[in-house]
């Protein structure tokens, strides 16, 4: 095996022999003591051999196994600095193994801390160390100045993908922001995502999913989030229904906020039954969005508050409220015969009824609150008209009081 591994570095090619040699759970074949002449490669070989032995003795990840896996990645980083693009996938395999070990160890530490009723100060330790090592791999790829097509720059996407996962588990949102800014600043030097991952479609899907989730939930850039999430959905294999559901959990609200697209009925119907209290189900929210039922919307938002906050979806879904209010105002306008003048008190009464509040509660304050909501709709361009505060009347355009903002279907 050692000879096959050294030949990979000699002839600049990635083979299954090298990938199996990197894997801690694969047995060593041959003499590990037959070190190659290159000092860096020899250190990598010895570290990997020690990792395999320790992994077999521990029968899985352990703190010592993690230390050796971390040393393995650092050793391969030093080698990769002078190699071309062929080394990206072996380096990614090594880094992915480290991330998986760190996540498993931190989860085990967290469970032990909960059982002992201790604090959780040490639960991020392995992932934090892991993140620093993987970030070094990312920098290696970004700093590759080789003009040839065989450079390592496409590897930046591979390690960004691992860092997305690592930072998500750590809750390190600022580190995600910094990483995305660096990738965007180097966009001209990097190949397109689809070309970078090649035939590894699963990696393309995961990368697009994380980037779309970041732009939608952390930056409130729904158009950019929609493009990445939609690419993830279209690239995902049609039989991977669980992945489809995970992507659609973000794409359904983002598609509406970005393009004003409702989800198709079969998309909502395909959602699993709502027995799981931690699951996110959109049937009621879509019904509220179509009917202008603010009360139903508020109840659903409260019911799903914790899972929405965990997934970062609370802010995007809270941005749906103006559209539901717009539906309500439009319904009042139709019931009033399509008049160009709508008394504020009628809209306030409909608003109070929809939210199960007492219609006359607050009196003038309720009317003032309703005017503020209507002024917001006018400022956003959702309603063409103006407010007559003295007469407490909403005056709307006779030709097009409510510009068409919503399409009936989505491409999802």
Swiss-Prot record:
Q: Where is the PCI domain?
A: 220-401
InterPro entries membership: Csn12-like, PCI_dom, WH-like_DNA-bd_sf
Keyword annotations: Cytoplasm, Nucleus, Signalosome
Does Nucleus show up as a keyword for this record? yes
| Cell compartment(s), UniProt | Cytoplasm; Nucleus
Where does it sit, as one GO cellular component term? COP9 signalosome
Q: Does the record bear Cytoplasm in its keywords? A: yes
Q: Which Pfam families match?
A: PCI
Query: According to the UniProt entry, where is the signal peptide?
Result: none
SMART domains reported in the protein's UniProt record: PAM
- What are the GO BP annotations of this UniProt entry? cellular response to pheromone; conjugation with cellular fusion; mRNA splicing, via spliceosome
- This protein's major location comes to cytoplasm
Q: Which domain of life is it from?
A: Eukaryota
This entry's Gene Ontology molecular function terms read: double-stranded DNA binding; RNA binding
Similarity annotation: Belongs to the CSN12 family.
Q: State the protein's purpose.
A: Component of the COP9 signalosome (CSN) complex that acts as an regulator of the ubiquitin (Ubl) conjugation pathway by mediating the deneddylation of the cullin subunit of SCF-type E3 ubiquitin-protein ligase complexes. The CSN complex is involved in the regulation of the mating pheromone response.
Quaternary structure, per UniProt, is: Component of a COP9 signalosome-like (CSN) complex.
| Protein name in UniProt | COP9 signalosome complex subunit 12
